[in-house]
C-alpha cells in the first residue's frame, strides 16, 4: 500500500510502477499508481479536512509542523540513504538535502509572520486590519532532483497557512515521497490534511484537471509547466505557482585566483551531476590569455571528476543521473552540438552501459549559430568567448529563460552593471549559481516561472490577503456629504 488518502494507506488501482537504483539496477520500490478515481478521493478528503484545519490556531498547526522537523532529525540517516539510493546522488549531498528540509521549518514559520501575518493600523474612527486566509485544497507536484527538499518548500508553508494538500511526487522518486509521507503521518496530521498519490503523467493530469482544486504548486521542466499553465488558463480563481528551471549564464571576467574561479564554475555547472535548475549551462569567458588559462584548468580539473555510487568511499563529488535515459539525453545533446560546429573540450562519457554514471562534458560554441535555447539537465557546459562586458551581458540575456545568472569579477562596478542589465531572478557575484538562501525568494522570470517565487516568498502564494476597516461602534458622522439630510424636519 503506497498511497496515503484520508489517513489510510491504500493500494493504487493504476499501473504497476517499479523504481530501481539508477546505477546498480536494484529494485528499491514498487507499487501501483493512483487512478483518476483515487485522485478524486484524495481531493474530497482534503476538502473535508480543510475547514477544521484552517480554523486551528497558527500555533496548533505549527506544533504539528515542528513535530515533523523533529522526526526528520531523528530519521536523518534513514532518509538520507533513501534519497541517495533512489536519485543516485552521493550520501554527502543527500544528507545536505535532509538538513535543508529541517531548516526550512523555522524559516517558513518566520516567513509566514513577516510575509502573511496580521497587521493593524489605527485610524481616527476605527482601525484598518490586514489578515491572510488559506486558499483551500492545493496540489503539490514534486521534482526528482530534490525529492525531499523542493516539495517540502511548498508543503510546509502551505500547511502552516491552513491549506490541505494532495502531494504527487515525481514518478522517478516514489520511494522518497512515501518515506517523507510516513514521517508526516507520525507527526500527527489529521486525516485528509495531507494526501499522497503516486503516479506518472496520467495521475498528474487527473490531479491538475480536478475542478474542486484551489491551486497547484509545481517545480519541474518548462515543458510541463507550460502545459499546466495552458490547462489552467481561464481559471483565475486558482493559484498557480511554477518554477521551471533555466538556461543559466555564468560570466567569467578578470580573476585573481584561477583555481578559485574553476572551483566556483564546477560547483555551478556539475554539482548534483548538473541536475539543479540553477546550474550554469552557458559559460561566457573573456577572450585573452587569462581566459585561455582558465579554460585549460577547467578542463583539467573537470576530467578528474569521476562519478560514483551513493555509498562509495571516499565519497565522489557527483553520483549518477536520475536514470540511464537521462544520461543518454545529455550525450545526445552534446553530439548534436558537436554536429552544429561545436568544439569539444571534454567529451561526456557513460562509464558503464546500463547505468547513469556520466562524466562531465564541456564544449565551446563560439561563432556557432542556431544553438537551441534549451535546458540540458545534466553535466554539460557550453562555452562562449566575449570581447567586452556589454557583449557578455547581451549574450547572457539571449535566452527565453531567466532563473539564475552569475559573475566572477573583482570589480563591484561590473556587478552593479549586471544587476541593472540581467534578466534573472537570482543574480550572484563571486558565488556559485547553485547557491541560494531560503531567507530570500527563489524563482525566475520568462520561461523560468510565473512570478511566484518560492523559499522566503512561498508564504505569498499559500494565502490570500483580507483587508478590513473596523470600528467597535457606529455613530452618525459630524459632517455629512453634500445632499444628505438627516434633520428632523418632515419633507412635504
Swiss-Prot record:
The active site is at residues 243, 277. Pfam families: Aldedh. CDD domains: ALDH_SGSD_AstD (cd07095). Its EC number is 1.2.1.71. It comes from the Bacteria. GO terms for biological process: arginine catabolic process to glutamate; arginine catabolic process to succinate. GO terms for molecular function: aldehyde dehydrogenase [NAD(P)+] activity; succinylglutamate-semialdehyde dehydrogenase activity. Pathway: Amino-acid degradation; L-arginine degradation via AST pathway; L-glutamate and succinate from L-arginine: step 4/5. It catalyses: N-succinyl-L-glutamate 5-semialdehyde + NAD(+) + H2O = N-succinyl-L-glutamate + NADH + 2 H(+). Signal peptide: none annotated. Belongs to the aldehyde dehydrogenase family. AstD subfamily. This is N-succinylglutamate 5-semialdehyde dehydrogenase. It comes from Escherichia coli O6:H1 (strain CFT073 / ATCC 700928 / UPEC). The gene is astD.
Amino acid at each position: 500500500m503506497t498511497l496515503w488518502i484520508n489517513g489510510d494507506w491504500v493500494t493504487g488501482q493504476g499501473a504497476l510502477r517499479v523504481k530501481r537504483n539508477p546505477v546498480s539496477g536494484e529494485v528499491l520500490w514498487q507499487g501501483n499508481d493512483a487512478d483518476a478515481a483515487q485522485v478524486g478521493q484524495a481531493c474530497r478528503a482534503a476538502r473535508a479536512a480543510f475547514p477544521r484545519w484552517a480554523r486551528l490556531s497558527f500555533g496548533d498547526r505549527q506544533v504539528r509542523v515542528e513535530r515533523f522537523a523533529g522526526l526528520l532529525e531523528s530519521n536523518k540517516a534513514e532518509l538520507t540513504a533513501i534519497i541517495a539510493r533512489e536519485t543516485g546522488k552521493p550520501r554527502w549531498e543527500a544528507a545536505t538535502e535532509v538538513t535543508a528540509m529541517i531548516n526550512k521549518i523555522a524559516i517558513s514559520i518566520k516567513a509566514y509572520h513577516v510575509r502573511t501575518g496580521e497587521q493593524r493600523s489605527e485610524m481616527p474612527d476605527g482601525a484598518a486590519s490586514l489578515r491572510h486566509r488559506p486558499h483551500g485544497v492545493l496540489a503539490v507536484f514534486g521534482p526528482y532532483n530534490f525529492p525531499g527538499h523542493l516539495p517540502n518548500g511548498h508543503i510546509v508553508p502551505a500547511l502552516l497557512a491552513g491549506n490541505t494538500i494532495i502531494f504527487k511526487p515525481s514518478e522517478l522518486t516514489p520511494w522518497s515521497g512515501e518515506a517523507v509521507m510516513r514521517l508526516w503521518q507520525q507527526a500527527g496530521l489529521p486525516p485528509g490534511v495531507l494526501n499522497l498519490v503516486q503516479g506518472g503523467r496520467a495521475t498528474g493530469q487527473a490531479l491538475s484537471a480536478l475542478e474542486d482544486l484551489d491551486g497547484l504548486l509545481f517545480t519541474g521542466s518548462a515543458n510541463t509547466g507550460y502545459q499546466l499553465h495552458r490547462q489552467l488558463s481561464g481559471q483565475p480563481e486558482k493559484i498557480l505557482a511554477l518554477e521551471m528551471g533555466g538556461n543559466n549564464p555564468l560570466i567569467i571576467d578578470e580573476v585573481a585566483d584561477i583555481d578559485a574561479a574553476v572551483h566556483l564554475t564546477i560547483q555551478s555547472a556539475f554539482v548534483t551531476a548538473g541536475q539543479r535548475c540553477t546550474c550554469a549551462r552557458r559559460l561566457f569567458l573573456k577572450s585573452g590569455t587569462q581566459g585561455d588559462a582558465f579554460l585549460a584548468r577547467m578542463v583539467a580539473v573537470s576530467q578528474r571528476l569521476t562519478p560514483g555510487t551513493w555509498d562509495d568511499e571516499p565519497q565522489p563529488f557527483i553520483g549518477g543521473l536520475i536514470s540511464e535515459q537521462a544520461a543518454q539525453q545529455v550525450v545526445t545533446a552534446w553530439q548534436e552540438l558537436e554536429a552544429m560546429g561545436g568544439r569539444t573540450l571534454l567529451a561526456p562519457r557513460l562509464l558503464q552501459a546500463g547505468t547513469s554514471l556520466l562524466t562531465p562534458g564541456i564544449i565551446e560554441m563560439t561563432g556557432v549559430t542556431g544553438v537551441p535555447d534549451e535546458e540540458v539537465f545534466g553535466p554539460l557546459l557550453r562555452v562562449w568567448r566575449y570581447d567586452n562586458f556589454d557583449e557578455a551581458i547581451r549574450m547572457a540575456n539571449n535566452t527565453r529563460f531567466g532563473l539564475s545568472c552569475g559573475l566572477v569579477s573583482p570589480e563591484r562596478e561590473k556587478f552593479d552593471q549586471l544587476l541593472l542589465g540581467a534578466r534573472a531572478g537570482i543574480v550572484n557575484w563571486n558565488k556559485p549559481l547553485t547557491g541560494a538562501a531560503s531567507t530570500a525568494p527563489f524563482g525566475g522570470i520568462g520561461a523560468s516561472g510565473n512570478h511566484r517565487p518560492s523559499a522566503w516568498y512561498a508564504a505569498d502564494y499559500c494565502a490570500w490577503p483580507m483587508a478590513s476597516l473596523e470600528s467597535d461602534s457606529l455613530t452618525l458622522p459630524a459632517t455629512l456629504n453634500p445632499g444628505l439630510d438627516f434633520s428632523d424636519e418632515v419633507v412635504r
